[in-house]
Amino acid sequence: MKAIIVLLMVVTSNADRICTGITSSNSPHVVKTATQGEVNVTGVIPLTTTPTKSHFANLKGTKTRGKLCPNCLNCTDLDVALARPMCMGIIPSAKASILHEVRPVTSGCFPIMHDRTKIRQLPNLLRGYENIRLSTHNVINAERAPGGPYRLGTSGSCPNVTSRSGFFATMAWAVPRDNKTATNPLTVEVPYICTKGEDQITVWGFHSDKKTQMKNLYGDSNPQKFTSSANGVTTHYVSQIGDFPNQTEDGGLPQSGRIVVDYMVQKPGKTGTIVYQRGVLLPQKVWCASGRSKVIKGSLPLIGEADCLHAKYGGLNKSKPYYTGEHAKAIGNCPIWVKTPLKLANGTKYRPPAKLLKER
């Protein structure tokens, strides 16, 4: 009579096989167990897969955001985040978002000095929220701000639906009307105007140019000082005055000046402040954002649907519970990463035939 041996399913951090079975007579497969080492069994089921790189996809069972504004054609995410004319559309809500613009990108209205602020992070900050909307009202009256009255500057590289010249909807380029003189630092309070308890993302900045242009626009060709403060974070800037080479953005007009753009996050009910001199870009429409969207670095376009979004492999469908290969951030219904392949023995343990006893 054959003895029956039962191998229990064992999972340990040191094991690279999972095994279960009973005695049998043939053994084309070898598995490794925690208690008995290598064991011959008659059949196994692979539990791991090694994915190949593929396109990213929409995550099954949830809304996935690729571009901030899918219907804003020929617009970068920075265009949308700054509310460039012709790039103002609805940002759909999403539980998951793809971070796809990993390098600094430009915005067509005006040459931006990316290296002086964290503005390149603004699209990704917005992408991390589930719900994002642009306010319908301006946060301050820029024309009557301290140091005014101001006229609001525009750029021929920023045409909108009604004019051949415009500017970002999130900022007002404050150019003195009559009082083109130097000024001591001025302060404007930025109220909280979001209505649903959201975070308020307020965009602001300043313009600088060569000395002759600064004198013509503002009456002061010296470097100007700027400070923003909100939610316990204070940032200081001094404008850079110099002869910048003419630069054309997105097929627009050559620009001799540059703008520095920054943002501050205001929590519900909290007021921010901006201290400024000449050349300020005062905040106008603000972003109201709430909820959290899981963010993963990927590439566009999003094609089809997938169970899992993996930073290295793209969209994955969970065909097996484990995977090998590159370990990276993943979101969704994802297989578990393991270092070496796992197998489940569904056959029986091999036992060599017993030797015949000599008759006496």
From Swiss-Prot:
Swiss-Prot/TrEMBL keywords: Disulfide bond, Fusion of virus membrane with host endosomal membrane, Fusion of virus membrane with host membrane, Glycoprotein, Hemagglutinin, Host cell membrane, Host membrane, Host-virus interaction, Lipoprotein, Membrane, Palmitate, Signal, Transmembrane, Viral attachment to host cell, Viral envelope protein, Viral penetration into host cytoplasm, Virion, Virus entry into host cell
Signal peptide boundaries: 1-15
Job description of the protein: Binds to sialic acid-containing receptors on the cell surface, bringing about the attachment of the virus particle to the cell. Plays a major role in the determination of host range restriction and virulence. Class I viral fusion protein. Responsible for penetration of the virus into the cell cytoplasm by mediating the fusion of the membrane of the endocytosed virus particle with the endosomal membrane. Low pH in endosomes induce an irreversible conformational change in HA2, releasing the fusion hydrophobic peptide. Several trimers are required to form a competent fusion pore.
Gene3D superfamilies in the record: 3.90.209.20, Hemagglutinin Chain A, Domain 2
GO molecular function, one term: host cell surface receptor binding
Extra remark beyond the main annotation: Major glycoprotein, comprises over 80% of the envelope proteins present in virus particle.
UniProt record, GO biological process: fusion of virus membrane with host endosome membrane; fusion of virus membrane with host plasma membrane; symbiont entry into host cell; virion attachment to host cell
GO-annotated cellular components: host cell plasma membrane; membrane; viral envelope; virion membrane
Subcellular location: Virion membrane; Host apical cell membrane
Glycosylated residues, chain numbering: N40, N74, N160, N179, N246, N317, N346
Species in which this protein is naturally found: Influenza B virus (strain B/Guangdong/55/1989)
SUPFAM superfamilies for this protein: Viral protein domain
Protein's name in the database: Hemagglutinin
